[in-house]
Amino acid sequence: MQIEWDLTGEYIDSGGRETLHDALTDALIVLPREHLRQLAAITIEDEDPRGKALGIWRHDHRGVGIALYAGPHVRSLVRLPPEIRLFALRLHFGYTLFHEVGHHVTRFLNKRTAPPRKAAAVEQKIERWADEYAEKRLGKLVAHWQKPGGLAETPAARQALDLALKALRFDTLVTETAESAGTIVPVRSS
């Protein structure tokens, strides 16, 4: 799998291209390698040519791939306080990547779970499955950041992460199980 950067903007307001690179790297760490199998490329571009998407999963003459659009992510976070933008961008970018990988897993790798084409609400089901996949992976990303040496190891960083989760309208659920006591697991609000 290749990672292709096709950006013309500098994205200074969001910390620059390095922040986008770090956001993608963080998200890839918590994705199982088998879920990326047969994916030709992940492309990071400035804008969706149609002007409506944050990212897309595609299966065309170029193979199977994911395109993430940096411009909409950055614009949606400009009004947030600077101290939480780092986490907000990483969460937003990660969620979009996870959602698109969820489409890949559902439509391409695990065809048994894909709904039949004649089902009444096929697209809604596929979108719901991709959202559920993204929510699970986002929880793993947050847990990864909270480990010793992680991005949200300090109390100030955890507070910024909590504020970013709230700013992105993710309700937080603190699980009290033995293996994940104190871990924040985002649950998408309805």
Regions found by a protein language model. Name each.
Residues 2-18, 136-190:
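Long, well-structured alpha-helical subdomains associated
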Residues 13-14, 77-87, 115-121:
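Short, flexible/disordered intra-domain loops and linkers
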Residues 19-38:
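Zn2+-dependent metallopeptidase catalytic core
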Residues 40-47:
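Long, charged, glycine-rich C-terminal linkers/tails
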Residues 47-91, 107:
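Active-site scaffold of zinc-dependent metalloenzymes
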Residues 91, 106-136:
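Post-HEXXH active-site segment of zinc metalloproteases
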Residues 95-108:
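Active-site recognition of the HExxH zinc-binding catalytic motif
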